[in-house]
């Protein structure tokens, strides 16, 4: 993907008095009392908004929240106003809608250095259909466009792709820029040796990533529930562990590809097995070659952790996507925690560590090590698609640098 123009290239002359449509990813979790339980995404969007305000722009902020079917009060962005205002040190104005006369009035009345938060863009089905008329209405209140929502960059929606046809310049925000620099940079031009750790329960959801990474990495470490499909493909007994029967041939061919490309492929040599899928299950450590009948593997074992650690110690770049085990259960979190701790240590030694979205991010945050990594990706699906080498519509739509 070609390099995209960044918001940092716009100065006061470009921004003062201009209305800037900023698509952020403010899709934060809310509890039943509509309180924000994790404001990471809001905080991540602040640098771009502050930069625009300092240059005298008027910011029109748009986001989705959840997956509403039509107007759904519990998916309103209203609960975000107080936290946004607090972080920006000004009073954010809330619009009752994201298009229409009322929004036009509020946008027209916005002073330089003011912020208007539009209501959830997904209250309209036209958003996800990328309807050009809807995109035109969204764009009509602004002069230019900044996309800082990496988490939805893999979707061609009205607020991520459609609006760029009506607003120029259309540029990447700082968060989007950082994601692209790290994820595209890591894949296109990594410091070697380059390792990828891929976990998660299903091979099927990670096939594209594994195939794409096999062409680029020196070491590939596999963990999580997907390993049992690989074991079974190699003729091992896996007890009651999760297996995707229709992916056995694929697992065999991935092992062959790794061999032919000279990639060191590491599968766990021992696993923590349980008698049931529960936090309080009976558990024991067994070699991968001796998983007993009626037991299921829920984490990688201590020998595997040691082998993985030795391999990772040789690296200069590491990408991690997907947990090593069922880390939601304390008993089966050791493998995932060990990887998180080791990557934090490696970062301190100058290794580039990239946590590629999804559950690995949750695992790193649970371990309190988020600020110890080089880069934590905010995109789940978007990170995966980028690592798979797929073009992202929300990025393609932005101006070339």
Curated annotation (Swiss-Prot):
(2R)-3-phosphoglycerate binds at residues 24-25, 27, 41, 63-64, 66-67, 122, 154-155. Its cofactor is Mg(2+). ATP binds at residues 206, 225, 297, 328, 359-360. The keyword Transferase applies. Gene3D superfamilies: Phosphoglycerate kinase, N-terminal domain. Pathway: Carbohydrate degradation; glycolysis; pyruvate from D-glyceraldehyde 3-phosphate: step 2/5. It catalyses: (2R)-3-phosphoglycerate + ATP = (2R)-3-phospho-glyceroyl phosphate + ADP. It comes from the Eukaryota. GO terms for biological process: gluconeogenesis; glycolytic process. CDP binds at residues 200, 224, 322, 327. Keywords: ATP-binding, Cytoplasm, Glycolysis, Kinase, Magnesium, Metal-binding, Nucleotide-binding, Transferase. AMP binds at residues 202, 206, 225, 297, 328. Pfam families: PGK. The keyword Transferase applies. Mg(2+) binds at residue 359. ADP binds at residues 200, 224, 327. Its main location: cytoplasm. Belongs to the phosphoglycerate kinase family. Monomer. PANTHER family: PHOSPHOGLYCERATE KINASE (PTHR11406), PHOSPHOGLYCERATE KINASE, CYTOSOLIC (PTHR11406:SF31). This is Phosphoglycerate kinase, cytosolic. It comes from Triticum aestivum. The lineage of its organism: Eukaryota, Viridiplantae, Streptophyta, Embryophyta, Tracheophyta.
């Amino acid at each position: 993907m070609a390099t995209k123009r960044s918001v940092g290239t716009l100065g006061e002359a470009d921004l003062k008095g201009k209305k800037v449509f900023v698509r952020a990813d403010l899709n934060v979790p809310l509890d039943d009392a509509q309180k924000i339980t994790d404001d990471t995404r809001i905080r991540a969007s602040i640098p771009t908004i502050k930069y625009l305000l300092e240059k005298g722009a008027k910011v029109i902020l748009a986001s989705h929240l959840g997956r509403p079917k039509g107007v759904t009060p519990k998916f309103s962005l209203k609960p975000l106003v107080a936290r946004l205002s607090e972080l920006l040190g000004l009073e954010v104005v809330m619009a009752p809608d994201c298009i229409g006369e009322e929004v036009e009035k509020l946008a027209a009345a916005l002073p330089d250095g003011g912020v208007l938060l539009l209501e959830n863009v997904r209250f309209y089905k036209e958003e996800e259909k990328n309807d050009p008329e809807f995109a035109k209405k969204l764009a009509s209140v602004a002069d230019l466009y900044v996309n800082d929502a990496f988490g939805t960059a893999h979707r061609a929606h009205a607020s991520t792709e459609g609006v760029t046809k009506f607003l120029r310049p259309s540029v990447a925000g700082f968060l989007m820029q950082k994601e692209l620099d790290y994820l595209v940079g890591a894949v296109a031009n990594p410091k070697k040796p380059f390792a990828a750790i891929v976990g998660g329960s299903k091979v099927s959801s990670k096939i594209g990533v594994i195939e794409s990474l096999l062409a680029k990495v020196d070491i590939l470490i596999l963990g999580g529930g997907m390993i049992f499909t690989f074991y079974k493909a190699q003729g091992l007994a896996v007890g009651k562990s999760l297996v995707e029967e229709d992916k056995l041939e694929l697992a065999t061919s991935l092992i062959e590809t790794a061999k032919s490309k000279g990639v060191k492929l590491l599968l766990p040599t021992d696993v923590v097995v349980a008698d049931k899928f529960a936090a309080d299950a009976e558990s024991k450590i067994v070699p991968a070659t001796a998983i007993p009948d009626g037991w299921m593997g829920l984490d990688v074992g201590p020998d595997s952790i040691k082998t993985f650690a030795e391999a990772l110690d040789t690296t200069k770049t590491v990408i991690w996507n997907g947990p090593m085990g069922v880390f939601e259960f304390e008993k089966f979190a050791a493998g995932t925690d060990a990887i998180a701790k080791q990557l934090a240590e490696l970062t301190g030694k100058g290794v580039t560590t990239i946590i590629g979205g999804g559950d690995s991010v949750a695992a790193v945050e649970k371990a309190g090590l988020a600020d110890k990594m080089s880069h934590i990706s905010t995109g789940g699906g978007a990170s995966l698609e980028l690592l798979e080498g797929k073009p992202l519509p929300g990025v393609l739509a932005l101006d070339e640098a």
